[in-house]
Amino acid sequence: MNKKTKKLTLILIVVLVILAFFLTPKLLDSLPKHFSISSDANFYIVGYHNIEGYKLDDSEFKKVSDEKVDIVKGQINPTVKRAELSNRYLVFSEEGKPHGVIGRVTAIDFKVGEIKHHKTDDYAYTSSGSNPDYYFTSASNYIATFDSTLKKLDKYIFEKPAILSDFSNEGNHLYFLGSDAKTDSNRQNPNYLYHFSFHDNKLQLENKESLFEQPEVTYYFNNSLVRGNYLYATSSGYHKDSTKEKVILGQIFHYNMDSGTKEFIDLPEIAPSNLYELKGDLVAIEHSTVYSKKIGFSLFHLTNHSSQFIDLSEFGFDVNKDSLKDVKQIDDDTLLVLVGNKILNYQISTNTVLSQKEVDPHSFHIWVK
């Protein structure tokens, strides 16, 4: 081998080493990860770097499994909805580091114990939604659709940039709220109800209507859900158009989409935001700690519109640091509440926390089998 050949060989080896250094992590990152499913677990707590299995034993938390597995590399926006699909998959978006860099969509399969990632520009940057089988992501100018395998099925581009709110629908007709990203001629951002159909893996805009109009004020609307022909959305108040003065309230907006009837239902606490669907007609509603100065949630019945506020401030949470992360219902009288670095066992009938346990501070979701 002459000197020239040796030099070329050395250069080739160096190039291959450099390529391996940069490509191997990306290749490994795209491969599915696996974790063990425990037959003893009644529910799992999902964190950035682990999945813990638990059951309740005489109302006390008993850990039955703890698997270390890297799930989140960047960060999750806690205000963006996570989807549970087909009673099997937890699907959510994460943002890359630093904030705003290309993110990815993740699916955790709780039937076979598999975690898949899909790197994409079309992750849920500002909001997301779901129906029983599909996950919808949105930024300021689009809504995209993913199935449980993380295959992107379609992407709709809005004519005008729009900021959407998180939503939950039952079937293939999607209803969600949004406002134009830019102000109109009156320097306002009116709220709209969007109606999309989703058939043959295609998103189609069917209708866009003004959600609620009242002279001289503009209302704030947050997350929404649809049951039958009824739309429910959290509303944290309004601002006066002339002065921009904010009036903070606590209400649920109720819209009968058949009759056109619209009403506001008062809640026991101000500044509602995220919705957590529980069993039957029960919904947990998170409230902004900035305005309420409390950590807790409202339990709201969709049928009779009754509600009560569950104040968790007495359990040592810091209203400036801690936040509500998830609420799940495991039977008619029991809620699991993930807040800060604790999981709480809450009994509905007695308005009592029966037990609590510290968990990993990066825990973000409860999966109930």
Go through each PLM region and give its residues.
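N-terminal Sec-pathway targeting helices
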Residues: 1-19
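An edge-strand/N-cap motif at the start of beta-rich repeat modules
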Residues: 23-73
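Residue position within the beta-strands of beta-propeller blades
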Residues: 45, 91-93, 136-137, 176-178, ...
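Intrinsically disordered, low-complexity segments enriched in Gly and acidic/Ser/Thr residues
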Residues: 244-253, 257-340
